[in-house]
From Swiss-Prot:
EC numbers, comma separated: 4.1.1.48
Metabolic or biological pathway: Amino-acid biosynthesis; L-tryptophan biosynthesis; L-tryptophan from chorismate: step 4/5
Signal is among the record's keywords: no
Gene: trpC
Keyword Hydrolase: no
GO biological process: L-tryptophan biosynthetic process
One Pfam family linked to the record: IGPS
High-level lineage: Bacteria, Pseudomonadati, Pseudomonadota, Betaproteobacteria, Burkholderiales
Protein name as it appears in the record: Indole-3-glycerol phosphate synthase
Keywords of this entry: Amino-acid biosynthesis, Aromatic amino acid biosynthesis, Decarboxylase, Lyase, Tryptophan biosynthesis
Catalytic activity of the protein: 1-(2-carboxyphenylamino)-1-deoxy-D-ribulose 5-phosphate + H(+) = (1S,2R)-1-C-(indol-3-yl)glycerol 3-phosphate + CO2 + H2O
InterPro entries assigned: Aldolase_TIM, Indole-3-glycerol_P_synth, Indole-3-glycerol_P_synth_dom, Indole-3-GlycerolPSynthase_CS, RibuloseP-bd_barrel
Family: Belongs to the TrpC family.
Any GO molecular function: phosphoribosylanthranilate isomerase activity
Class in the EC hierarchy, top level: lyase
Amino acid sequence: MNDILAKILAVKAEEVATARQMRSEAELLREAQARQDVRGFAQAIEDKIAQGKPGVIAEIKKASPSKGVLRENFDASEIAASYAAHGAACLSVLTDVQFFQGSHDNLRRARAACPLPVLRKDFILDPYQIISARAMGADCVLLIVAALSPTQLRDLEAVAMDLGMDVLVEVHDEAELDVALGMKTPLLGINNRNLRSFETRLETTLNLLPRIPAGKRVVTESGILQPDDVQLMRRHGVQAFLVGEAFMRAEEPGAELARLVA
């Protein structure tokens, strides 16, 4: 595991330990189970694709470790409503505080501002974080193969599915893909950004495509900046996209989404 990812995960472990002291997992689980409002994340992507349109997961993030602050004028509710008005299938909201300047409140506010399903984008390593995600309103969680063992991945996926949530599993190379293909979720994210070097290559997705069986919905992540990038992926059968930076840097995120997929 690379240094940046290891550092983030160490912070996450501390965050979970602190959160558990403030609120028990049993209490949090009761709150999560009491919510009967899951929005179908994978289904929303499929519905958009069935209309002949790309399934865009539009991301809400203020900053990143590699790029710094992406958007000074940041209002999660406003951005979410703009995305929904311009054809996004789903939202992705960063909830990491230390590295991405995100928050749980951003997710709550984004979800309240529109009818779209929401992914909690964070570095998840403990069931507590998944239960917390559902309690705050998330409909889907991200599991990163580079950060977890195969056993952890299966166990965390089961926790999410028991709560009615979808799971987006993220890979970057062939070895990680082989692990991910053993999971139940149909949502397979391919991150074009190398978490070790932060270099971004769209070929990462294209090179892994031949190894992916039918029944998996590929979501290409990172480096989708221009309409040409979307068209390239669609020509190769990739119909789902997770895009953040290109939208966050634009004056009007929703309008940039519409331009990207036009």
